[in-house]
Amino acid sequence: MKIGILVQMIGWMLLHCVATGIETPEFKPLFDGKTLDGWVDVNTSPDTWSVKDGVLVCSGTPIGVMRSEKQYENFILSIEWMHLEAGGNSGVFVWSEGEVFRENRLPSGVEVQMLENDYPKIYNRVREYVSGELFGAGTVTTIPDHPRGKRSSSVEYRCKGKGEWNHYLVVCVDGVVKLSINGKFVNGVRGSSVKKGYLCLESEGAQIHFRNIEIMELPPGVIKASEIVPLAK
């Protein structure tokens, strides 16, 4: 699905809300800048996540995730992130499981990757292995817009390096995910095997900071029970 079509779809959704008297969607904070309220630790430790000076700090150890309290279906996620270490690895999962059953400690879902720019050099990976890759993780499958195997690579490298803030705008509608990095849409996947689930922030070996985490919930679509992840216990 092209970006223009997706934007039109969102526009129609908003117009529908106005025409039918439904509350017009707006961005609402997922992080209050003071506490971890609204988030649930899944499989990390009490020292993994903390708040300092309005910033959500992730130590990077152990590997695992923290999830949102509720599930989301159609939405726009706005999030800023900054790596503190060269080659740092992290990400945010959308439409994710609320529990982890995999040996590598990460959930099934659609991952929006956040890699520090030196990652390919430090770990001797291909240049395409950079921030902004999108892919189905675990049991979740997607169709990449810009294939690198099962992953979708960004068409333009726009992320800033360690010590600098980056902004992701993640649009998730009816199994389609589109990613804007620092003000420009550069990647997408479609045909996700799940269309409703949790948001998860990832701890994966390096300190990373998050701030200004907001979500705009959009009207729901037609969805099968098999496309909704189970409620976490």
Residue locations for each model-derived region?
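Bacterial N-terminal signal peptides
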Residues: 7-16
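Carbohydrate-interacting regions of secretory-pathway proteins
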Residues: 21-233
